[in-house]
Amino acid sequence: MNTQKPFENHLKSVDDLKTTYEEYRAGFIAFALEKNKRSTPYIERARALKVAASVAKTPKDLLYLEDIQDALLYASGISDKAKKFLTEDDKKESINNLIENFLEPAGEEFIDELIFRYLLFQGDSLGGTMRNIAGALAQQKLTRAIISALDIANIPYKWLDSRDKKYTNWMDKPEDDYELETFAKGISWTINGKHRTLMYNITVPLVKKNVDICLFNCEPEIYTPQKVHQQPEKYLLLGELKGGIDPAGADEHWKTANTALTRIRNKFSEKGLSPKTIFIGAAIEHSMAEEIWDQLQSGSLTNSANLTKTEQVGSLCRWIINI
């Protein structure tokens, strides 16, 4: 009888969990490349604004260019979300403040000052987007690893597009699965006659919290109609996924994830259930690695992997598809 624990396929010691300097460096570079890629639309909008605003001879002339009024409002510090709460008079006042306090004092350089202020607030918007992007990239990496494991095992799968908000249109594996991971909300497969459906970012009623990864014992077609996420006995696995690569925030991310996983175990235990729990993280520092290792040894945490280590992620995904 095989008594080997699932994590022992890819973790031999606590040190295997830790993120190395080289892995941090690669993670930061990948994040910087993604940030550069995502900044392109912001820069192009600023260039378009400069062209449109260049017909103005004075800052006040900008008020008569109707097609740039939203951009002027943005440059004044009013976000798209905030402007919904403002009257037309409020908007005009904000734009006038921009002109009188910043553009007019800039003299002949008022166009450059406008573009600078526009980009300043666009940068805030990009920063907010990038804070969410680490989690999205982590999910994409995990998804690609799961479908690769399914492909290697020659197991057909279906996938759910996150843009389908009804969560009912499960599609067969496409011939060309390029960038499928970008939009996958869920993946489903059958192994040894057992139906498995994995979903991302689901609010689990039993714990009243959002959980990053949930694996269900059900066919994909019944997941939404039968509200499977409301049936505790259908949960096979729940997991936390932390894609942030900054070591300074690693311990805090683990504390948040650990609290969530403990709550999950407690709530399911109250129902006499014990689904598997996993933790996957990109930034794993020494102290948290020891805590994770202790939980793996005791069995409170079923499996874990460092997201920056391809072999670990691959091994974990191979285990997931065989549950």
Swiss-Prot record:
SUPFAM superfamilies: Restriction endonuclease-like. Gene3D superfamilies: 3.40.91.10, Restriction endonuclease BsobI, helical domain. It catalyses: Endonucleolytic cleavage of DNA to give specific double-stranded fragments with terminal 5'-phosphates. It comes from the Bacteria. The keyword DNA-binding applies. The record marks K81, R131 as: Interaction with DNA. This is Type II restriction enzyme BsoBI. It comes from Geobacillus stearothermophilus.
